[in-house]
């Protein structure tokens, strides 16, 4: 098989770089690049600067693992939240969706993925050791009384919830799962706030 050469010109490199975005193929990347250069060069410059700044400054919260520019994110630092209640989600986008329901007042842990052996994602890749440390040795000084599993209702999300749930239950930790108001195969990021709020309230 012939080796595919990387594009050498700036436009080709831009098109290739845009393809790292989910769902963006060669034609979509080309349209984006052409639009930015033809219609919005100032916007392209702002985009490039903002992306560079985010890559340099955005890390992970030391407590919940979500994206944060500070060691402890604003959610974890909020003293009004219930530190004895921990909600586990797959991604920062899922955390945002749960927050928008206004029905959860505890803290979070963001796995940054889900168990999927075919994709090379196991317990280590979803920061399971950090999660256990977070639960068994909470730095808030308040024991965690309930862990809410809010992974997606995909096969990988269910496998992740099952794995985490079994380990935590064996340690005597109360574990609940959000209710199935969310369709099988559904992802939290695309569920309306009302449905998600009901799923949280009906957890068991």
Curated annotation (Swiss-Prot):
Q: Which Pfam families match?
A: RecR_C, RecR_HhH, RecR_ZnF, Toprim_4
Which Gene3D superfamilies does the UniProt entry name for this protein?
3.40.1360.10, 6.10.250.240, RecR Domain 1
Q: What does this protein do?
A: May play a role in DNA repair. It seems to be involved in an RecBC-independent recombinational process of DNA repair. It may act with RecF and RecO.
GO terms (BP aspect): DNA recombination; DNA repair
Molecular function as annotated in GO: DNA binding; zinc ion binding
Instruction: Zinc fingers (C4-type): give the ranges.
Output: 61-76
Keyword Protein transport attributed: no
The gene that this protein is the product of is recR
Instruction: Describe the family membership recorded for this protein in Swiss-Prot or TrEMBL.
Output: Belongs to the RecR family.
Alphabetical keyword list: DNA damage, DNA recombination, DNA repair, Metal-binding, Zinc, Zinc-finger
Using the record's annotation, list all stretches that form the Toprim domain.
Answer: 84-183
Q: Which SUPFAM superfamilies match?
A: Recombination protein RecR (SSF111304)
Query: Know the name of this protein?
Result: Recombination protein RecR
**Organism field:** Polynucleobacter asymbioticus (strain DSM 18221 / CIP 109841 / QLW-P1DMWA-1)
